[in-house]
């Protein structure tokens, strides 16, 4: 009887899972991608459109383009093409050309943060968040095309990260150059996401080593075991800032780290089951709106709600 109950529950869960996957795939291919492949590119200045009005019909007249937005769109079109979206491949090619020709300053300086519509440098800041998304997007584009220029750009980007962003203590990386405070967990998270994508497609030894180092850093420094949560901001030694007016928790980032660590477990064989479970269960406990069900933007350090709004990411 108990075994039959387990089988029924597992079968029901599988049916629900397949229904969710079907709904997501339908939304992606029948609604999102048809709009995005038609409207994502800036026909006047090149590169992607930065933002749309709420009706999805009129792009805002933003006076800039940010490197990480270009990279995110390159990832979307690369992955979409791999999933069979026919219009996405040429868009990925165009986005790759824009990224490397407009946003890249060369192997000594790397990626700029922001350019004008005309493609001139507007903000030359070297930001690890941008570098991380470029590693991620270029890895996916290489997976799609095996373009050797994309491979070279990833290696050159990681050269800069290792040479210029690495903290002298060996504990993680600076957010930006020149270095500033507070230090943040978020660029580390997205860097690991990019490294895992590069590791998976190339089996690159440096991507393995850096990913393993970031997984260890998360367990050792970024995750607060006592609270079962992860603060966003840290001092120069990666001690969490205790002032609740200057720090907070984001459940969305806990969900992201859970996925990243689960993926690292698949690639490395290291067991993160305990911390993945803790991240998800605690984020669901304190980070979901009690009636709407959405992931709230932020919580205070004691996990009480702070910003009850939600972003779609």
Where are each of the predicted segments found?
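Glycan-recognition and catalytic cores of secretory/periplasmic carbohydrate-active enzymes
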Residues: 2-313
């Amino acid at each position: 009887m108990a075994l039959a109950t387990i089988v029924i529950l597992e079968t029901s869960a599988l049916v629900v899972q397949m229904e969710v996957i079907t709904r997501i795939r339908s939304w992606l291919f029948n609604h999102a991608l048809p709009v995005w492949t038609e409207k994502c590119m800036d026909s006047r200045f090149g590169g992607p459109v930065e933002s749309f009005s709420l009706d999805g019909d009129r792009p805002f007249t933003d006076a800039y383009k940010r490197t990480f937005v270009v990279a995110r769109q390159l990832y979307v079109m690369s992955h979409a093409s791999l999933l069979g979206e026919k219009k996405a491949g040429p868009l990925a090619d165009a986005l790759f050309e824009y990224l490397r020709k407009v946003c890249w300053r060369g192997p000594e300086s790397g990626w700029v943060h922001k350019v004008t519509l005309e493609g001139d440098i507007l903000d030359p800041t070297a930001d690890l968040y941008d570098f991380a998304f470029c590693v991620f997007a270029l890895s996916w584009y290489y997976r799609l095309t095996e373009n050797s220029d994309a491979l070279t750009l990833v290696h050159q980007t990681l050269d800069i990260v290792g040479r210029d962003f690495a903290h002298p203590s060996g504990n993680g990386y600076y957010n930006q150059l020149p270095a500033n405070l507070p230090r943040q967990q978020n660029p580390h998270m997205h860097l690991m996401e990019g490294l895992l994508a590069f590791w998976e497609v190339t089996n690159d030894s440096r991507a393995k080593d850096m990913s393993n180092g970031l997984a260890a850093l998360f367990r050792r420094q970024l995750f607060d075991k006592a609270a079962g949560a992860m603060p966003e901001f840290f001092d120069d030694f990666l001690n969490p800032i205790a002032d609740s007016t200057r720090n907070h928790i984001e459940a969305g980032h806990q969900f992201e780290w859970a996925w990243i660590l689960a993926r690292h477990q698949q690639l490395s064989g290291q067991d993160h089951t305990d911390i993945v479970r803790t991240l998800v269960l605690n984020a669901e406990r304190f980070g979901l709106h009690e009636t709407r069900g959405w992931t709230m933007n932020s919580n205070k350090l004691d996990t009480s709600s702070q910003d009850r709004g939600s972003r779609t990411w």
